[in-house]
Amino acid sequence: MSLPKLHVAVLMGGWSSERPVSLMSGEGVAKALESKGHQVTRIDMDRDVALRLAEAKPDVVFNALHGTPGEDGSIQGLMDIMGLTYTHSGLVTSVIAIDKELTKQALVPHGIPMPGGRMVKTADLYKADPLPRPYVLKPVNEGSSVGVAIVTAEGNYGSPISAASKGPWQEFDQLLAEPFIRGRELTTAVIGDRALLVTELRPKSGFYDFDAKYTEGMTDHICPAEIPDEITEACKDIALRAHRLLGCKGTSRSDFRWDDEQGVEGLFLLEVNTQPGMTPLSLVPEQARALGMDYSDLVEAIIAEALKDAGKA
């Protein structure tokens, strides 16, 4: 893929819990663009971001932010007001996709299989279990498994849950409780209007948490996943349908849990990530690489999608 030489502002950092990941993603993107001869302005997201974007006057903004405010519609709304062309999804899609409950409301009526569950106030956890054990607790709008916990039948956080157990959810006021789905972690990337591959993730710690995601050697990535063809095709179909239904742009990544004793009936979409990581260990670059697309070409492909959507390509 060949792009004209562009001035690209790379937005990274910010103040969410995923700041370290965003900085790694952003620096990787910036170096890739420079290797292709593009002019790059690095912007570490802060409260003066509008001024810095206005001063930079970029041809396009590469959004390498993760979490709030780069993934929840905030920065997208600002860039819309400023008339900037930017990568990845727009305001409405971002608002919906970062909220796991809103995502369910948008996708389940269209036949996308997602786990059941319910919203629960953190304070109510210490009164009674919201679901039969085992179940999963997760913040409604965090990524990278921040704040996620599996509550086991053995009472790993007490029975009932004890505030003294210092669960990772305690800094959040509201949580989503979902039934725990035994089985395997799968993920599928979409670029443009094409689902790539399916990767199976096998964390050596048993849980695919923040450290397992971003520490080299802590998770085995099997790409393409060694799973039945019908599961591969189901993952790709669901990922592409979810991408389209939510109105995602550029790239997205759909994460699944698969109970391999249940066949295709055991496959559930957990979430759609509209700002998937672009670090050396990240899954979208890995799948692209397995299909013969190197990292710098992937970055340019994402920018090309943004230019096309803006009518500039």
UniProtKB/Swiss-Prot annotation:
Gene Ontology MF term list: ATP binding; D-alanine-D-alanine ligase activity; metal ion binding
Residues binding Mg(2+) 2: 271, 273
Compartments where found: Cytoplasm
BP-aspect Gene Ontology terms: cell wall organization; peptidoglycan biosynthetic process; regulation of cell shape
Binding residues for Mg(2+) 1: 255, 271
Enzyme Commission code: 6.3.2.4
Superkingdom of origin organism: Bacteria
Gene Ontology CC terms: cytoplasm
Cysteine pairs bridged by disulfides in the record: none
Keywords recorded for this protein, A-Z: ATP-binding, Cell shape, Cell wall biogenesis/degradation, Cytoplasm, Ligase, Magnesium, Manganese, Metal-binding, Nucleotide-binding, Peptidoglycan synthesis
Residues at which ATP binds: 130-187
UniProt cofactor note: Binds 2 magnesium or manganese ions per subunit.
Family: Belongs to the D-alanine--D-alanine ligase family.
NCBIfam families xref list: D_ala_D_alaTIGR, PRK01372.1
PANTHER family in alphabetical order: D-ALANINE--D-ALANINE LIGASE, D-ALANINE--D-ALANINE LIGASE B
Listed name of the protein: D-alanine--D-alanine ligase
Classification lineage: Bacteria, Pseudomonadati, Pseudomonadota, Alphaproteobacteria, Sphingomonadales
